[in-house]
């Protein structure tokens, strides 16, 4: 079966990746090895699925919402011993493979209208991370989102999302993906990124994560203001000054200038202050 008669549906945010070089880069970035079990989100017409099945991976489990595409995927790949398919919304259906065990890695062409919720589902939140984490996620996302995820302190794109994602895993750029690489072409630039989630022992504890979230919400709500002003409610000025210095933070800085580890250090100091009170 071919998909030539199936047109992209706007309500599903469908833009099919057709550039072979980018498809190859995605598979290369996943670094698939013998035994790897892969979750593919949004297989579409199967261009990436075909490459994943040809890789060393042991199993490819695809999740597709569009019923018409499900029929074509099942006809094209249903007899392949490494392939399984689940029809449904990736935000709500179980993501485990047929044996009930989770995948090792994720490859996803994320519809731009569900990027935030899907990141929560695949990686989790700072205070509620996915556990156990996937070994690696290779994600095709809107360029602006990719910039915010991997931005470094001091950059205009550095945000609360940057801090959260970089405390949950190692985020890196794979390749740019211009609109011409899709059918139909989207109106925005895209990018492939790679995220290697940290194991639990390298992530902030639940208590620290809650403290960091509290600080991020306060600080980035008024990102143009200095921390001396935005963080004033957390404790007395003298205590805030002392804790900031211990964390390597200047209260004259703005939130986008503070590194993720420094936010953790400040949250730790505040937690200790609260415990001693």
Regions found by a protein language model. Give the residues of each.
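Short helix-coil junctions and helix-kink-helix linkers
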Residues: 232-233
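Short, well-ordered alpha-helical segments
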Residues: 239
